[in-house]
């Protein structure tokens, strides 16, 4: 049986408290979408960044709702504010950082959902992102290839 349709209201969805002031609200989980996609909204204070990494099995998209994000996709660096969209295809190293002077809100989508399953698992455990639970990310096809490039 395929996925059932549903509506997720703004104040709904399980929250992963990743670090003080940083959270991810899971808006569409893999099991709800027949594993076709996973979507979450991240609140990222200024200075929040990711390691340079890539996904083996999922493409990643980002849509900046507020604040400013600097993306590095492959060798290209782009700074964008609200309305900026980014596509990070599987196999291409990428990273991002909250820049500018305010906390950012960013909507992220993985398709298919495999890479997002790591976030679902970490939300259940309420594991702080600083512990860098690499084995969870690796299990779901995400591989770090370097430190934050910013």
Can you annotate each of these PLM segments?
Residues 9, 23-26, 40-55:
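Conserved short histidine dyad/triad with adjacent acidic residue
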Residues 70, 81, 90-116:
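Ligand-binding loop in jelly-roll beta-barrel domains
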């Amino acid at each position: 049986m395929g996925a059932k349709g549903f509506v997720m209201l703004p104040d709904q969805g399980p929250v992963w408290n990743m670090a003080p002031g940083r959270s991810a609200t899971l808006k569409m989980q893999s099991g709800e979408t027949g594993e076709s996609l996973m979507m979450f909204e991240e609140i990222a204070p200024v200075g929040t960044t990711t390691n340079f990494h890539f996904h083996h099995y999922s493409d990643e998209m980002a849509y900046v709702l507020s604040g400013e994000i600097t993306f590095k996709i492959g060798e290209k660096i782009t700074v964008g504010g609200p309305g900026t969209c980014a596509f990070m295809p599987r196999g291409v190293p990428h990273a991002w950082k909250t820049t500018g002077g305010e906390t950012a809100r960013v909507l992220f989508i993985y398709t298919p959902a495999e890479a997002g399953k790591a976030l679902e698992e970490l939300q259940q455990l309420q594991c702080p992102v600083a512990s860098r639970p690499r084995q969870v990310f690796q299990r779901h096809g995400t591989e770090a290839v370097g430190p934050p490039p910013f």
